[in-house]
Amino acid sequence: METVPPAVDLVLGASACCLACVFTNPLEVVKTRLQLQGELQKRGTYPRLYRGFVASVVAVVRADGLCGLQKGLAAGLLYQGLMNGVRFYCYSLACQAGLSQQPGGTVVAGAVAGALGAFVGSPAYLVKTQLQAQTVAAMAVGHQHHHESLLGALETIWRQQGLAGLWRGVGGAVPRVMVGSAAQLATFASAKAWVQERQWLPEDSWLVALAGGMISSIAVVAVMTPFDVVSTRLYNQPVDGAGRGKLYGGLTDCLVKIWRQEGPLALYKGLGPVYLRLGPHTILSMLFWDELRKLAGWGQHQGS
């Protein structure tokens, strides 16, 4: 893999993930609706407005129009830029310091970088979740916040809940991205090396990065989905006058309530759309990042 300065990795990582976000945001809208459907209700006791991936896409388009599939895109792009810029910058610093050469170092570096990125990007993810949950009353699932735009949502939350309100739900976001980042970066590097060792593809081919991203995406979805469901619930729940969540007290409380009231399988709600969103996003992000790093490395060689 090409070596580039951490500051360059910040720009490349943010750019790669923003590019991927443009393609995968419709899947994020569907995933959010499915994860909020039947909140804290036993299976079979609530109307299923969204059923599976294709039917859910149709339901979103009927309720919100074709543009409804790109709800929350601005917030999503802001989140991807902030979170992944910080994440790839910190990961690059760790690799530069030699941590990735130590046993388990890639996992640790990926987890720490993911935690820092999740904290920085949390306000954008909060708004993204709330915007994507919004729809007409007949198709509404979860609490409806009635925001008009990204900036309007940030202003409303700031005015009503203060600075702390912008980071509400961060307790669920940090472990979510920690496990996802550790799985993604560790398995991508290992998968790429494994594919290259077998010489199935030319060593510098973009197909190597594509194969690595596909393998990595399976690991990411497997470990990240329960935390993804919890994060969606924490970010979208209504709050009281003191800014405290009305439904969940935090990560552990949310996990326990979902398990007890909806059953353990509810932690994998929307698994199909989750993979259809996180899978392509992981594949595209890692592919774009790897190819942009090659271009940056080539540019450095040409300039020297």
Swiss-Prot record:
Pfam families in alphabetical order: Mito_carr
GO biological process: blastocyst hatching
Membrane topology designation: Multi-pass membrane protein
Signal peptide: none
Sorted UniProt keywords: Membrane, Mitochondrion, Mitochondrion inner membrane, Repeat, Transmembrane, Transmembrane helix, Transport
A Gene Ontology term for the protein's cellular component: mitochondrial inner membrane
Protein's UniProt keywords contain Signal: no
Matches recorded under PROSITE patterns: SOLCAR
Subcellular location: Mitochondrion inner membrane
Transmembrane segments: 7-27, 45-65, 98-120, 170-191, 206-226, 278-301
Reaction it catalyzes: a dicarboxylate(in) + sulfate(out) = a dicarboxylate(out) + sulfate(in)
Solcar repeats by residue range: 4-97, 101-194, 204-295
Main location: mitochondrion
Record bears the keyword Transport: yes
Function: Putative antiporter that exchanges dicarboxylates and sulfur oxoanions across the inner membrane of mitochondria.
Family listed: Belongs to the mitochondrial carrier (TC 2.A.29) family.
Record's protein name: Solute carrier family 25 member 34
Organism of derivation: Bos taurus
Lineage: Eukaryota, Metazoa, Chordata, Craniata, Vertebrata
